[in-house]
Amino acid sequence: MLDRFLPEFDRALRAVAGITRASRPNPADAIVAPTDDGAKLSDTERRHAAGLMRVNHVGEVCAQALYQGQALFARDPAIRAQLDEAAREEEDHLAWCAQRLQELHDRPSLLNPLWYAGAFAIGALAGRLGDKISLGFVAETERQVEHHLDGHLDRLPEHDARSRAIVAQMRDDEVRHGDNARAAGGIDLPEPVRQAMRLASRIMTTAAYRI
């Protein structure tokens, strides 16, 4: 267990501190250069876009924590490898959101350590309950994240092409993660659990938009 805990602890520190590096190119770089669309945003639009991207950044901090907690207690090595691979892609999302926040002259959430700790505890609990439940938790989480990102694509300023490109790629990745979890044997979670997850998500997104 210790040989897995130490690398995960290092990853946790990097996620909370925002010291992450993407393994894939930022999808926004294929759309428009960083300085090109900033002038098109009013100050109100910039603050709104930054609030949404801060929420997305928090979501990726939580995703890192959830996957790390689940992988730590996964019983099947193949499931652990699947969770680790998804976490690496989520780390790309984390780096892209952090870069976009810098471009929008804003900052990540001040509550990131709290978000991470809570999400890790939930992920560890899901992992301890068994791989099928853990995968079901992944599938339901990604389904809710997909819905959340669709909403952000509707709410982002129309001409904020860079944020839109990042969110669109994140959405595609989340859909795939959810499909993979279901294909690997994830079970449907009870409705009260799904409702509790939605409530927790609303609390997080409301706070992260501002703080």
Swiss-Prot record:
Keyword set includes Transport: no
Principal cellular location given in the protein's record: membrane
Listed InterPro entries: COQ7_proteobact (IPR047809), Ferritin-like (IPR012347), Ferritin-like_SF (IPR009078), Ubq_synth_Coq7 (IPR011566)
A single GO BP: ubiquinone biosynthetic process
Known catalytic reactions: a 5-methoxy-2-methyl-3-(all-trans-polyprenyl)benzene-1,4-diol + AH2 + O2 = a 3-demethylubiquinol + A + H2O
Entry's cofactor comment: Binds 2 iron ions per subunit.
Cofactor(s) for this UniProt protein: Fe cation
Tree of life domain: Bacteria
Chain residues that bind Fe cation 1: E60, E90, H93, E174
GO MF entries: 3-demethoxyubiquinol 3-hydroxylase activity; metal ion binding
Top-tier EC class: oxidoreductase
This enzyme's EC code(s): 1.14.99.60
Membrane topology: Peripheral membrane protein
Recorded family membership: Belongs to the COQ7 family.
PANTHER family in the record: 5-DEMETHOXYUBIQUINONE HYDROXYLASE, MITOCHONDRIAL, COENZYME Q10 BIOSYNTHESIS PROTEIN 7
NCBIfam families registered for this protein in UniProt: DMQ_monoox_COQ7
Record's protein name: 3-demethoxyubiquinol 3-hydroxylase
